[in-house]
Amino acid sequence: MDITLLLTALILGIVEGLTEFLPVSSTGHLIILGDLLGYNDEASKVFKIVIQLAAILAVCWDYRERLIKVAVGVPSDRSAQRFVGLLLLGFLPAAVLGFLFHSTIKNVLFNPLVVATALVVGGLIILYVEKRAYHPRVTSVDEMRWGDALKVGFAQALAMIPGTSRSGATIMGGLIFGLSRKTAAEFSFFLAIPTMLAATVYDVYKNWTLLRVEDLPVFAVGFVASFFAAMWAVKSFIRFISNHTFVVFAWYRIVFGIVVLATWQFDLVSWSTP
């Protein structure tokens, strides 16, 4: 087994886990790093599905008590039914757009230059949102209205553009629509479960012929790295936003995006282009 490939899997797994639930775009980071590390062949498509699944399972594990309570209560508990309804409503816009444009978006927009541009634009939007007067109307997911979930769902649909960040779009959308920081972040985490599971199932369906037994050790390394990195990131992020704004993530996005664009402009790196 190629040690370099295993190390690449470890790096990408950690990056996926750390960035999946932060407003910095995990997909964008994987596209850029995959291109930089030369891991963008057919097998890499399946690998990215595997490490994304690991991140989903990590957030399920972190919130297992809440999720089990909801699952058990769905048949008879109105609050559990309402919670599931909020998630399904928030999931709907991305589901429809993903079904219609999934292949087009992946074929046309999944390249480092689009990602870098989206990182910068998204960072500027975060700075704008943070400068607005902030008076949260909703302080827990249970207080959310149906309209809140749908509006956050439309914000999530914007994140189909790589580099935008699904969590960034949903959290910033939540803040704009009156959710508290913690509520916006937690709803973003919960909303990730049906959204990412659906995307994972669809990607597996489209790419299952690319699965090879010899790739399993690489996938296993990436899966484990992503799972534990995501577990740590989710807990740390919730603690962080209790006392901080998202400005640091905005500047990180802007600087990272500008660096990638500069390396392309001055031919320092041969990035893949459409």
Swiss-Prot record:
Signal peptide boundaries: none
Recorded family membership: Belongs to the UppP family.
UniProt-listed PANTHER family: UNDECAPRENYL-DIPHOSPHATASE
Organism of origin: Azoarcus sp. (strain BH72)
InterPro entries from the UniProt entry: UppP
E.C. code: 3.6.1.27
Cystines in this chain: none
UniProt protein name: Undecaprenyl-diphosphatase
Catalytic activity: di-trans,octa-cis-undecaprenyl diphosphate + H2O = di-trans,octa-cis-undecaprenyl phosphate + phosphate + H(+)
One GO CC term, this protein: plasma membrane
Subcellular location: Cell inner membrane
Record bears the keyword Cell wall biogenesis/degradation: yes
Topology term for the membrane: Multi-pass membrane protein
GO biological process: cell wall organization; peptidoglycan biosynthetic process; regulation of cell shape; response to antibiotic
Keyword terms of this UniProt record: Antibiotic resistance, Cell inner membrane, Cell membrane, Cell shape, Cell wall biogenesis/degradation, Hydrolase, Membrane, Peptidoglycan synthesis, Transmembrane, Transmembrane helix
Stated role: Catalyzes the dephosphorylation of undecaprenyl diphosphate (UPP). Confers resistance to bacitracin.
Something else known: Bacitracin is thought to be involved in the inhibition of peptidoglycan synthesis by sequestering undecaprenyl diphosphate, thereby reducing the pool of lipid carrier available.
GO terms assigned for molecular function: undecaprenyl-diphosphatase activity
Transmembrane segments: 3-23, 43-63, 83-103, 108-128, 157-177, 184-204, 218-238, 246-266
